[in-house]
Amino acid sequence: VELGIPAQAAKGEDDMTSSLDDTSHAADADATPARASVVFLFDVDNTLLDNDRVIADLRRYLVRELGAERTDQYFELFERNRAELGYADYLGALQSYRVCYPRDPHVLAVSSFLVNYPFANRLFPGSLDALEHAGRFGPTVILSDGDVVFQPRKVERSGLFDAVEKRVLIYIHKEQELEDVERRFPAQHYVLIDDKIRILTAVKQCWGRRLTTVFPRQGHYASAPEVQRYPAADLAIERIGELLDYDLPALMQAAQP
């Protein structure tokens, strides 16, 4: 689904991951998955889906429903929760807002907006084509961070759940769960596509030449100052659709130690 989490929370995370993938033998703890030659691991937010635009839509909606001042308060609560939890939790921030304003009648409308948002409309051009292209070479897997309600909902409603044939893993800190990733989807080689250079670097430090890192320069992280503080990814592309320009040999050969 980042942080040390209590055993009960960890169990809940594992249950949630399995429920997303209950028809996949790779997600069944009792099965012994076959070792693939290559597995493709795709992030969601700002990799396959324009999450910056989702947040912009949310802010506009909140301003209309709650007003500018309370919208700012909502996002302050959101950032505070993210600092404490280690992941984005929009519904959790709404619950915190509700504690502050228990009689605000707009809370239910905002909740409905989040849960029913048309995420499929926010897929980047070429996202589904990139998944289909990679799927010709090996299994494609969603590897994401997030809460246990909103992030799975986003994956399902966007169509990504079906596009990867229900192979979905959502952790709190995915870069700390690589052993579980390998257990569920064993492979000789992995290709990780993620808009956060920090994540790419952390996974590369663990898997080394067994991993090809692909950095799509999409979303606000692409121009963040921290990008310059990390080693370059094995491959950088300007948009997710450019993944179609690379065949399997090119992706494998791009892997650096």
Show which residues each predicted segment covers.
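Short, acidic loop-to-helix structural element flanking the phosphoryl-transfer center
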Residues: 115-142, 172-180
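Conserved Rossmann-like nucleotide-cofactor binding loop
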Residues: 47, 148-149, 198
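A metal-dependent, Asp-based hydrolase signature
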Residues: 54, 65-68, 78-115
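Conserved SAM-binding loop
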Residues: 48, 140, 192
